[in-house]
A protein has these predicted regions:
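Domain-level detector for secreted/extracellular nuclease and nuclease-toxin modules, and
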Residues: 4-5, 13-265
Length: 265
């Protein structure tokens, strides 16, 4: 009898703690950011023109998510972001240098259960998969932005070596470029799912076969991109925008002017 009472008490405490955590995580987002639209973050996109989620196949069940410093086109089918957009500049990245990484990952409370990844999906996987940031934690200029970057809606299952070495180098190169660019640089990052891709976890989170990062310098109208396997690989020479579109089928810059490319810095 006493053991049962203890068990019931612990269960109630767990439920209360879980509810408090969910409320606390939701507090990271403004009322506008909780509305699942790009109204609160249109200025993160080039020319303040967000990606139209209606252009995403309906089978992917897309949603629009705003955070303070990045925007996400999210799929309830893959349980991953499809595209994450950032607007980077020297001021933001210089502020980010002093921000401490938290490593507090969490399921995005704005998303319906069954349409999102859970922490348990990444546990005990063979082969192991990292929770790979699409908007890097190192880009976050303040504590709130850092916390938001650890939402699973900003993650894809990523090969550990790729995440910690190859992709980390790509991210660092983009930051160096953005600091020197003298204006706003827009970065589009996301997964590519080729036929035969695998899944992880009870929620069947899709594992990308490739990853992309497209950089657009609004001042010079130059664009360049990486498209790399989600595996231990080497950094390849960046491609121009036309090659990126042909490789991925993604015309992410719409009708924005693109006048050239640029290599790694």
């Amino acid at each position: 009898m006493h053991l049962r009472n203890i068990a019931v008490g612990l269960s109630a405490f767990f439920l209360l703690a879980t509810g408090a955590h969910a409320r606390g995580v939701m507090d990271l987002y403004s009322s506008q950011e909780q509305r699942l639209s790009f109204d609160a973050c249109a200025d993160i996109f080039p020319a303040s023109t967000p990606i139209n989620t209606a252009t995403v196949p309906a089978s992917m069940k897309p949603l629009a998510l705003c955070s303070d410093h990045f925007a996400v086109v999210y799929s309830q089918t893959s349980k991953t972001p499809l595209v994450v957009v950032e607007r980077l500049n020297a001021r933001q990245l210089n502020a980010a240098k002093g921000e401490e990484r938290t490593n507090h990952f969490y399921a995005d409370p704005r998303l319906p259960k069954g349409g999102r990844a859970e922490l348990s999906d990444y546990h005990g996987q063979q082969p192991a998969m990292d929770r790979g940031h699409q908007s890097p934690a190192a880009d976050a200029p303040d504590a709130k932005a850092m916390a938001q970057s650890f939402a699973l809606s900003n993650m894809v299952p990523q090969d550990p070596t790729n995440n910690r070495k190859i992709w980390s180098k790509v991210e660092a190169d983009v930051r160096k470029f953005a600091v020197r660019a003298g204006g706003d640089v827009y970065v589009f990052t996301g997964p590519l799912f080729d036929p035969g891709h695998s899944t992880i976890g009870d929620n069947q989170v899709w594992v990308p076969t490739r990853l992309f990062k497209l950089v657009y310098d609004a001042s010079s109208q130059r664009a360049w991109a990486y498209v790399l396997p989600n595996a231990e690989t080497r950094i390849q020479k960046p491609m121009d925008y036309d090659t990126f579109v042909k490789s991925t089928g993604l015309k992410l810059l719409g009708n924005l002017p693109v006048s050239g490319s640029v290599g790694r810095s």
